[in-house]
């Protein structure tokens, strides 16, 4: 007896799935978007469940019929002989897709189908199946389209990509059947038969390596689980199923090839090993913690297959270009004689590889359209992103400007014991970046391009920027960090954009300071305020210093090293802990300093403490939920300054600073206090090209203005 089936798959795998299913004995009747229709005997059905590496679900089509209204759907489901599929003591769940004029809600549609099944069994023997939406023994699919209802039974009960070996995954997991599709497109079964090795340099939780091992060792993916819904099917033949399982186990063969997965993250490597152990292939594979630039082939020929990170937004894509350039260089330099298959969603990143692809295949990683680039790594496939590749005329102008800035600012920075400074700030308008040096790292902040600039132009400039910066500044591509700077609103300025927690120690005069170049848009150190911080390094010992909106308290570190007693107030616990770490790094005794987590406005209203020097550097705007009110510095600066002046000793000094470019100081403040605009004195050499980076004022009581 033959059964009608629909086997679903991820978008883009339809014809690859068709070939696989034909090889397993399915008589294919139609290929449709995201699936294949066909007919099969019971042994073939069992083999599909055991051996398909590409399928999502295997659905046994039960019946179809015309149905536009609720009553028609119910009648079709009541009339069907459900006892030929399962008995009343089984648990069920319904997945409903589609709609009609009357049935517009999938939950409502599922309810009608369920009621029809229940009514059928009640009419048959007075009993009914129970519903279990979480883990049903019988999963029924109902699809209503063009007034035709099609109902099917999910023979396995879950998507076949859920092999059972992956309990946890990495940050961007690749579905097992998509990984299998990558390997099939790359001709891995044929290459493995010829003795080729395999290496995934971005292995993550090990999916590609594990799937490759299962293919090469002829391990049926359906063997790993024994909780298929088949066992609850009324027509299930357990003896035949066990016979085919045994045959599948007997087909497993020893491996004569080497399969290696590497990743820079040691924790994810531990996870990959655990997954491989659950898959039963741990003795067949090797997982090591290794950075990309340390990867080397262990054999003369093999397949490099990987799913490197790829961003969906322009800023993310740009940041990944150096990684892809390094991947291309590594492949070309070290893996001659090998094949490669690289999956990415970005043509820009594919181009950054610098290598010519023999073939491209469209695959979908979840909803994201990707391309699998298959390459032959040989001397004939010349690398186009070599360090000495010629620059365009515009890129050469950028190179010249960066080289000029570097020659000037490096000497100045060395002389002043500074290891972090701005080297470029959109000097050439067509390359709208700010570039900051932190030791031997470069942070590139891309100003968001106007909507009028086509995406391809913006991407071209980004690629040229990333081509030029390492050459002109002598920075290793791995030490380029790219961010996209845009006008920030409210709490966005302090929100995380990553979670690497990688810290770097930089030097500024006598102070050592902690920066984080990856996790936030800002790094923990505002470079433009350097001269203000160095001013505080000249304070007299015992000076009572208040740093309001202190951020990571880098200004207070300078003051404390001079012997001042500091009070540091900020709403963020994260930054206050960072501030304390800055103090510890400089061997400053924390017991002489205060770190207070408060809304600065509220704290200044209530405190009775007095200070000799106050540094007030609030954000331009903040609407943090933890604040009592929205902060708008143009609107609120008068009240903030008045509150700060109340906390000064009679001969004290307030330094007020803001990065709001269009800031205008309220004239009445000059009538009440002695106010001096000291902005020019606070702009250091590296910010001379952008003198409006901030505004800074020295404010004292009038009778101390001349002191």
Curated annotation (Swiss-Prot):
UniProt-listed NCBIfam families: PRK11783.1
GO cellular component, one term: cytoplasm
Alphabetic keyword roster: Cytoplasm, Methyltransferase, RNA-binding, rRNA processing, S-adenosyl-L-methionine, Transferase
Record Pfam families: Methyltrans_SAM (PF10672), RlmL_1st (PF22020), THUMP (PF02926), UPF0020 (PF01170)
Top EC class of this enzyme: transferase
Cellular localisation: Cytoplasm
Gene: rlmL
Domain THUMP per the UniProt entry, residue ranges: 44-155
Function: Specifically methylates the guanine in position 2445 (m2G2445) and the guanine in position 2069 (m7G2069) of 23S rRNA.
Catalysed reactions listed for this entry: guanosine(2445) in 23S rRNA + S-adenosyl-L-methionine = N(2)-methylguanosine(2445) in 23S rRNA + S-adenosyl-L-homocysteine + H(+); guanosine(2069) in 23S rRNA + S-adenosyl-L-methionine = N(2)-methylguanosine(2069) in 23S rRNA + S-adenosyl-L-homocysteine + H(+)
Gene3D superfamilies the UniProt entry points to: 3.30.2130.30, RNA methyltransferase domain (HRMD) like (3.30.750.80), Vaccinia Virus protein VP39 (3.40.50.150)
Protein name as catalogued: Ribosomal RNA large subunit methyltransferase K/L
Enzyme Commission (EC) number: 2.1.1.173, 2.1.1.264
One function term, GO molecular function aspect: RNA binding
HAMAP family for the chain: 23SrRNA_methyltr_KL
Family: Belongs to the methyltransferase superfamily. RlmKL family.
Originating species: Legionella pneumophila subsp. pneumophila (strain Philadelphia 1 / ATCC 33152 / DSM 7513)
